[in-house]
Regions:
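A short acidic, Gly/Pro-enriched loop at the edge of an enzyme's catalytic core
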Residues: 82-85, 150-162
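Class I SAM-dependent methyltransferase Rossmann-like catalytic core
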Residues: 2-18, 40-43, 52-76
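Core SAM-dependent methyltransferase catalytic element
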Residues: 212-237
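Conserved beta-strand signature within the Rossmann-like core of class I S-adenosyl-L-methionine
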Residues: 191-198
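Conserved SAM-binding loop of SAM-dependent methyltransferases across substrates and taxa
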Residues: 94-106
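Helix-to-beta-strand junctions that scaffold the AdoMet/dcAdoMet cofactor pocket
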Residues: 105, 171-172, 188-190
Length: 237
């Protein structure tokens, strides 16, 4: 039976770590017996970094295989579910949050938007997200749109819940991130909730939501290997 595959986050970073570890080992082994002091010193420095690289690789594997699913469930557990909600996942990638929300719905629907850049996630495509939805048995409860978080193709007050994990920091400017938060506030229904997780800029997000009249009800940190993630929860009155 096929299993869903939610990819490797920031695959270029992982590749750099792997290559650095391999290069360090190769360099150290190749020049270990050299009499040239400069080479010995360089080999010593590189080899000293190998354990750190190995630890980072193990932490990344832990995140890909275990921790990001726990973090998804943590986020989804921060709001009660009736089953009829309209949900939006901003930066859905291969659909982790979108599908997780869809599995909590009965008559509701879960939407995902993204621009699907390969550098953000391995095999980061709409097709991969829909394949996961099919495998998870929620194909009829999800819908994907190719859209930027700063300009969403939805009317005001469309969603009961907006979710996002490790997405908004990819917007390169503070104004751009604030624009994304304004869009999240705009598409939320009165009484709706935004649950936004990231490793940076979360104070900006909370401030932007408050400027839209939203109440920031929680802002907490979680160590999710290999990152410290913060969750901002904001409610629209």
């Amino acid at each position: 039976m096929a299993k869903p595959n939610y990819g490797i986050d920031n695959p270029r970073f992982g590749l750099i770590i792997v290559l650095a570890v391999v290069a360090g080992l190769a360099f150290g082994l190749g020049f270990r017996k050299s009499s040239i002091e400069a080479v010995r010193a360089a080999a010593s420095i590189i080899l000293s970094l190998v354990p750190t690289g190995i630890i980072l690789i193990l932490l990344m594997v832990s995140y890909v295989k275990v921790e990001k699913f726990r973090h998804r469930d943590r986020m989804l557990g921060m709001t009660p579910w009736r089953g009829d909600e309209q949900v939006l996942d901003v930066g859905t990638g291969r659909g982790l949050l979108m599908i997780g929300a869809a599995k909590r719905l009965t008559s509701g629907k879960s939407f995902g938007i993204d621009i699907w850049r390969e550098r953000d996630l391995s095999d980061n495509t709409q097709e991969a997200a829909m394949r996961n939805a099919e495998i998870e048995g929620v194909r009829d409860k999800v819908e994907l749109r190719n859209a930027d978080a700063r300009e969403m193709p939805f009317p005001d007050g469309t969603f009961d819940c907006v979710l996002s994990n490790l997405c908004l920091h990819n917007t390169p400017t503070q104004e751009g991130r604030a624009a994304a938060c304004r869009e999240i506030a705009r598409v939320l229904k009165p009484g709706g909730v935004a649950i936004i997780s990231d490793f940076t800029h979360t104070d900006e997000y909370a401030k932007a939501f408050r400027e839209q009249g939203m109440e920031t009800t929680s802002s907490v940190s979680f160590l999710v290997a290999p990152m410290l993630l913060r969750i901002v929860k904001a409610s629209k009155s």
